[in-house]
Swiss-Prot record:
Protein name: Uncharacterized protein BBD21
Pfam families reported for this sequence: AAA_31
Keywords: Plasmid
InterPro entries referenced in this protein's UniProt entry, alphabetically: AAA_dom, DNA_Partitioning_ATPase, P-loop_NTPase
Amino acid sequence: MKKIAFHIQKGGVGKTTLSGNIASYLSKTKKVILVDCDIQQASSSTWFLNHEILKLDIKDFLLKKMDVDQVVRQIQKNFYILPCVPSGTFRRDVQHELQDFPYLIDDFCLELEKLGFEFAIFDLSPSFELWERRIILAMCEVITPLTPEFLSLEGINIFKEEFESLLKSYRKKVKHEKIICNMLNKSFKRHNLHLRQFKTFGYDLYEVGQDAKIAESQLYKKSIFDYYPESRSVLELSRLGDALCL
C-alpha cells in the first residue's frame, strides 16, 4: 500500500482540496482511502453533507481500539474516507498515546492494508507536532502544496529543514520530490515570478491554476473529475495521480 501525505506548515494552500481530488482520481483504478488527520475535519466536511452525523472517526480506532472497518465510510466505488470529528482533546489524547506507542500509525496503516487498500492519502493539519511527525515517518511520500506567494518561499524552506531533520533523527527514508503550485494565475506578474522561483527548487513541479469549478464541486460533495471533467485543472491533477502510480 502506498501512503501519501499532503503537508506544509501553512494553511490555505489547498491541502484538503488536492488530497481529496487526487484520492478520487486514484480510485478510478485503485482502492483508496482518504484519511482526515486534521481536527478541523476539512476533508470530512468536504465529502459529507453538513447534516450528516459522523458518529465514529479516527480517534475511535486509535484511542478506543475499535476495528478500523467499523470506522471507515464509503464515498463511492473504491473511494473511502476515515473521518475526523472535531474534539478539543483529540490532539492531546492521541499525542499521549503516541508517546506510549510510537508505532501506532504504522500499525494503523497495516490494518488499512489488510482491508485491501492500495493507496492511503493523508490530509494533515498545518502543524508539525508529534501527531504530524509520526504520520510523516510512516509515509512512503510527502507532497507539498504551495501557493504563488512570497511566504510560500519561506514556508517550503522551513518545511524542508524540519522534514530532513526528522528523517535524520529516526534514520527513515520518506520521499519528498513533488510540490504543487496551487491556485496559479499566470495573468498575475507576481504569480509568474514565484513560479519561476519554484522551478529552481529541484522538485517535480505541478501547476494547478485558479479554478472556480473546484470550489463549486465541493458544494456538491464531488471531485472535480466527477463534477466538471472539462476543468482546466484535470490534466495536471491527472498527471500527478499517474506519477503516484509509478
